């Protein structure tokens, strides 16, 4: 093990990484709050500024994947599809099996220049998660309670608001509604059998309302749907904590592009199209498990230096005064001051750990265990 690899495993560095992310995030959120004054004057200027502010925060997480853990991401697709990346609005459909699936998605967004403007249909609880939810609020992210009767008007209004977005955006949909677990899968397949739908081996039954509504509201804005099927080599089950400890993973993503005009206008037909898509995704996962790769040409988009430079800039600005302060605390010789400082460090580490816990499968939402039994 090299020195750098050894240092990545040391707990003492992790609070420093967390400190940079949290404090820079609070600064960014404050600046975002100030930009609200621009909305009545120039909505598009407000949006462009917030895309760049969000990039400065999200790219720190992408940096952990790309530069800290050196995780590699390989695309399986075709040249024509790759040439369109970052040059059109798109809806992204991604399987929700892994703790860092969102991070792999963000990595691709970063490499094709749409990280700051990326969107997601997110559960309402995330709005109240510090930094993440607050940043999303200023980005006009569409939040839902996952109760369609209550969500319909909110989701439609939020999607239509994005029709004049000034920068290319990728709108992420987790059509399964919740992260895959064996328990949720069993309940989901019971519902599939009751509805006469084919059983899926690697996915939950997709929820069609969000997809059909997004496609309907974003017609004329979005050019295509990108279906992304993600898996990891070596049957690995990566985690954000693993990334923080410098573990390297190899992510493979099969990407298929569907022009939006190929998706039916009728809601029922669009729902059937989505169910068929998930049957195809299941077949792709079966191929991957048998052959260790997806079909299609392989592309490895080069990582860009901006995520690393952004983090190093924030680290230089924030850690220099922190180190001076720490030296002053210990130089004072005051037991009370030292204990207070150590208590603060412990509380901060706990807070960062709670943020990481948002991504953990075993601590994920119970949504889906029983909700699959209800009609959409």
Swiss-Prot record:
Listed transmembrane segments: 125-145, 317-339
UniProt GO BP: CDP-diacylglycerol biosynthetic process
Topology Lumenal: residue spans: 146-316
CDD domains: LPLAT_LCLAT1-like
Domain comment, as recorded: The HXXXXD motif is essential for acyltransferase activity and may constitute the binding site for the phosphate moiety of the glycerol-3-phosphate.
Keyword terms: Acyltransferase, Endoplasmic reticulum, Lipid biosynthesis, Lipid metabolism, Membrane, Nucleus, Phospholipid biosynthesis, Phospholipid metabolism, Transferase, Transmembrane, Transmembrane helix
Family of the protein in this entry: Belongs to the 1-acyl-sn-glycerol-3-phosphate acyltransferase family.
Single GO term (MF): 1-acylglycerol-3-phosphate O-acyltransferase activity
Cytoplasmic side: 1-124, 340-376
Recorded metabolic or biological pathway in which this protein acts: Phospholipid metabolism; CDP-diacylglycerol biosynthesis; CDP-diacylglycerol from sn-glycerol 3-phosphate: step 2/3
Annotated Gene Ontology cellular component terms: endoplasmic reticulum membrane; nuclear envelope
Function per UniProt: Converts 1-acyl-sn-glycerol-3-phosphate (lysophosphatidic acid or LPA) into 1,2-diacyl-sn-glycerol-3-phosphate (phosphatidic acid or PA) by incorporating an acyl moiety at the sn-2 position of the glycerol backbone. Acts on LPA containing saturated or unsaturated fatty acids C16:0-C20:4 at the sn-1 position using C18:1, C20:4 or C18:2-CoA as the acyl donor. Also acts on lysophosphatidylcholine, lysophosphatidylinositol and lysophosphatidylserine using C18:1 or C20:4-CoA. Has a preference for arachidonoyl-CoA as a donor.
Catalytic activity: a 1-acyl-sn-glycero-3-phosphate + an acyl-CoA = a 1,2-diacyl-sn-glycero-3-phosphate + CoA; pentadecanoyl-CoA + 1-(9Z-octadecenoyl)-sn-glycero-3-phosphate = 1-(9Z)-octadecenoyl-2-pentadecanoyl-sn-glycero-3-phosphate + CoA; heptadecanoyl-CoA + 1-(9Z-octadecenoyl)-sn-glycero-3-phosphate = 1-(9Z)-octadecenoyl-2-heptadecanoyl-sn-glycero-3-phosphate + CoA; 1-(9Z-octadecenoyl)-sn-glycero-3-phosphate + octadecanoyl-CoA = 1-(9Z-octadecenoyl)-2-octadecanoyl-sn-glycero-3-phosphate + CoA
SUPFAM superfamilies assigned: Glycerol-3-phosphate (1)-acyltransferase
EC number assigned by the record: 2.3.1.51
Protein's name according to its UniProt entry: 1-acyl-sn-glycerol-3-phosphate acyltransferase gamma
Chief localisation class: endoplasmic reticulum
Protein's organism: Pongo abelii
Pfam families in alphabetical order: Acyltransf_C, Acyltransferase
């Amino acid at each position: 093990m090299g020195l750098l690899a050894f240092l990545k495993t040391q707990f003492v560095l992790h609070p420093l990484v967390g400190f940079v992310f949290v404090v820079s995030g609070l600064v960014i959120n404050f600046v975002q709050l100030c930009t609200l004054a621009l909305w009545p004057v120039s909505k598009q200027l407000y949006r462009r500024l917030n895309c760049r502010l969000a990039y400065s925060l999200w790219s720190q997480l992408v940096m952990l994947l790309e530069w800290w853990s050196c995780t590699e991401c390989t695309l399986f697709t075709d040249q024509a599809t790759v040439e369109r990346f970052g040059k059109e609005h798109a809806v992204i459909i991604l399987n929700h099996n892994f703790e860092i699936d969102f991070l792999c998605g963000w990595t691709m967004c970063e490499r094709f220049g749409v990280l700051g403007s990326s969107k997601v249909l997110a559960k309402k609880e995330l709005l109240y998660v510090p930094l993440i939810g607050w940043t999303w609020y200023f980005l006009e992210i569409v939040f839902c309670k996952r109760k369609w009767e209550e969500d319909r008007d909110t989701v439609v209004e939020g999607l239509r608001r994005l029709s004049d977005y000034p920068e290319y955006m990728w709108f992420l949909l987790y059509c399964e509604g919740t992260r895959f677990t064996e328990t949720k899968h069993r309940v989901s397949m019971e519902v599939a059998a009751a509805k006469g739908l084919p059983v899926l081996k690697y996915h939950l039954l997709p929820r069609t309302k969000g997809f059909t509504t997004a496609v309907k509201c974003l017609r004329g804005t979005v050019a295509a749907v990108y279906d992304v099927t993600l898996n990891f080599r070596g049957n690995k089950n990566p985690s954000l904590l693993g990334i923080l400890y410098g573990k390297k993973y190899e992510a493979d993503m099969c990407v298929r592009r569907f022009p939006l005009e190929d998706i039916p206008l009728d809601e029922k037909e669009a729902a059937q199209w989505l169910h068929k898509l998930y049957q195809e995704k299941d077949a792709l996962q079966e191929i991957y498990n048998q052959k260790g790769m997806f079909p299609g040409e392989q592309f490895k988009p080069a990582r860009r230096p901006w995520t690393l430079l952004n983090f190093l800039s924030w680290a230089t600005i924030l850690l220099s005064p922190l180190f001076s302060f720490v030296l002053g605390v210990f130089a004072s010789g005051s037991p009370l001051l030292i204990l207070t400082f150590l208590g603060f460090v412990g509380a901060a580490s706990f807070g960062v750990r709670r943020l990481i816990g948002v991504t953990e499968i075993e601590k994920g939402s119970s949504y889906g265990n029983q909700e699959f039994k209800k009609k959409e």
